[in-house]
Amino acid sequence: KSTLKKALDYIENPDKTDEKLFVSSYGCSYETADIEFQMLLDQAYQKGNNLAHHLIQAFEPGETTAEQAHEIGRQLADEVLQGKYPYVLTTHIDKGHLHNHIVFCAVDMVNQRKYVSNKQSYAFIRRTNDRLCKENGLSVVKPGRDKGKTYAEWDAQRKGTSWKAKLKAVMDSIIPLSSDFD
């Protein structure tokens, strides 16, 4: 439960969202989304540990405005979630590239069923995102090295505690010193 609250606090950070100007929600209030999500989870037919899902939608640097990015994020969430799942959408403007975070409840508001996260649902999200970007004259960002990273891995890397990131940094620093594979 506290992990959900931490994720929501992170994506709603006023320093990243222009004092929460770029924070919106559907089917819940962003101020109490963790509590509202938990209420839905308590009513779910299927139980499980997954409280919510977290999507990150990235845009090429300098290609869009925060307002347009936020609107495209809303369109993506509305199309993918079809009005069934409450969500919080934020647009982060503090880095060199604008990006959206969409955290949505793992249980729908209509039949209290869990969201099915699999290769097909991921492909549907990608297709919808790519179409929306093209319709708005934006580049389609290809998945990079971060593809497939779990939230725990992403969070550890963000905090500087990722053993994978540390190992990669060490390897990157010694590769130029090598003259062969031996």
Q: What does each model-identified segment do?
A:
Residues K1-D182:
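N-terminal nicking endonuclease/strand-transfer module with a His-rich metal-binding environment
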